[in-house]
Amino acid sequence: MATISINLKEGDIERPGEVIAGIDLGTTNSLVAYMKDGAPVCVKDEAGKSALLPSVLHFASGDTIIVGEHAREQLIKSPADTIYSVKRLMGKSYQDVRGFEDFFGYKVIDDDTESLVKIRVKDRFYTPVELSAMILKEL
């Protein structure tokens, strides 16, 4: 991930020029890019490879959450613990997705307290926003 210096005392970003960044939280893949000399440059991962990250989460044993390609590899083996296309559920009520629950390998539930859907994984419940934040954190 790119490093940006921040002057905590002043609250300013220390940079030689303006930094323009874009984040694509995609239904299938996500990535971060920035502008350099008028052209977009995708942020690369630690290995220097493309940082195109599959928007997939896998909840492994314990508290381990795997994000990206390794999570996508678990879709067939463990569909109930592997979350994909969560962006499609953001801001949706259970009424909005009623009749489509079987299209997901994971459990989409009705949450009367907020009238928004939640996703059940093992013994925990997550909102689509919480799950999307986990994907963004990996970028």
Outline where the language-model segments fall.
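N-terminal phosphate-binding loop and flanking beta/alpha elements of the actin-like ATPase fold
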Residues: 1-54, 59-139
